[in-house]
């Protein structure tokens, strides 16, 4: 149980775009109808945090702003109408479009319908690193166009053999989204899973399910040639671009066969040639978005079993020391690392 002994909490606020973060004492929010109050034991760090700090993000409309778009903790109170969760439940959540729902603070209010109820074996640190990267991979893989690649889910009838023998390419395999995309491709039965990464990360990605790891430094022409050597006459109808910059989007369109689909994690900066039948799609990985809600309810009923069974392995997590005091430095570190997630523990903040 998570009793509240104070009416205030420690939070990390961004006064304005381009400013440095500041620790402040603010009121603990209250759960409204359909919401839960969460004692926030861990918060995940993501590129969107430093991008918001540096140049802004359209979802963050109020300043001073609390950032942090994923976290995990214990339900401390439930609002009216919440029946499927109770005080003491362990959950993870995605940060929503208001200060009270973001994770760089000690207490968070979030919609109950989109909370991930955690398996007993999963730590808060691991869980806090899931909602952004894992959901981007899940939605981008399973939702039909224009929101995803439309690949069969592993919990559907024949879903694990629907793509048997087919090739798929995942650009940016060492990224957290890429690691999950590789594993989801393996669960879908793809016979050839090609990814790009630094050669030193090949063992990690092969353990997750990649059959071929190509050097990420290859030119688009060289990369396309290597993919063609591997796939032969088989069409590449699915490419997951987990990097999402203009160069990788161009590479993805060069690799994908006519009539195929490219899924990218950032808005497309390039277009498919007219008449090619190729599609370039953009994933917005939030279950609470109207276009994802029906799928989200189905997914939340099965997601934990994917980890409990060992079908999916969570990304490596590194806990940043200092609680919320460590966020500013950690966001700089985030720009230079790959293959793991950074999390902070808000209740370890010294004030």
Regions found by a protein language model. Name each.
Residues 5, 85-86, 256:
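Short, well-ordered loop/turn sites that connect or cap secondary structure elements
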Residues 27-45, 54-100, 114, 119-122:
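Glycine-rich beta-strand-centered segment in the early N-terminal region that forms part
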Residues 125-128:
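C-terminal boundary of histidine-terminating zinc-finger modules
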Residues 158-164, 212-289:
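Glycine-rich cofactor phosphate-binding loops and adjacent beta1-alpha1 units
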């Amino acid at each position: 149980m998570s009793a509240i002994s104070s009416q205030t909490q420690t939070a990390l606020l961004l006064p304005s775009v381009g400013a440095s973060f500041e620790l402040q004492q603010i009121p603990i929010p209250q759960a409204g109808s359909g919401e839960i109050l969460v004692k926030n034991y861990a918060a995940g760090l993501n590129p969107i945090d430093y991008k918001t700090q540096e140049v802004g993000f359209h979802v963050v409309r109020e300043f001073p702003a609390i950032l942090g778009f994923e976290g995990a903790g214990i339900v401390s109170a439930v609002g009216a109408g919440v029946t499927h969760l109770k005080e003491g439940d362990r959950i993870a959540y995605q940060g929503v479009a208001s200060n009270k729902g973001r994770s760089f603070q000690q207490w968070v209010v979030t919609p109950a319908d989109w909370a991930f109820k955690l398996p007993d074996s999963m730590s808060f640190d691991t869980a806090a690193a899931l909602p952004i990267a894992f959901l981007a991979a899940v939605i981008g893989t399973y939702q039909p166009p224009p929101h995803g690649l439309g690949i069969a889910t592993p919990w559907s009838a024949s879903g694990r053999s629907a793509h048997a023998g087919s090739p798929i390419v995942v650009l940016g395999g060492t990224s957290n989204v890429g690691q999950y995309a590789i594993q989801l491709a393996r669960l879908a039965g793809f016979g050839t899973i090609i990814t790009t990464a630094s050669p030193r990360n090949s063992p990690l990605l092969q353990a997750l399910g990649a059959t071929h790891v190509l050097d990420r430094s290859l030119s688009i022409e060289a990369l396309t040639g290597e993919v063609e050597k591997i796939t032969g006459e088989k069409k590449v109808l699915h490419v997951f671009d987990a990097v999402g910059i203009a160069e990788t989007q161009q590479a993805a369109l060069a690799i994908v066969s006519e009539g195929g689909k490219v899924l990218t994690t950032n808005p497309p900066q390039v277009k498919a040639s007219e008449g090619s039948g190729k599609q370039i799609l953009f994933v917005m990985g939030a279950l609470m978005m109207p276009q994802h809600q029906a799928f989200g309810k189905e997914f939340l009923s099965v997601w934990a079993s994917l980890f409990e069974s060992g079908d999916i392995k969570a990304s490596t997590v590194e806990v940043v020391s200092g609680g919320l005091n460590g966020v500013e430095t950690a966001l700089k570190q985030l720009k230079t690392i790959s293959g793991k997630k950074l999390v902070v523990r808000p209740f370890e903040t010294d004030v």
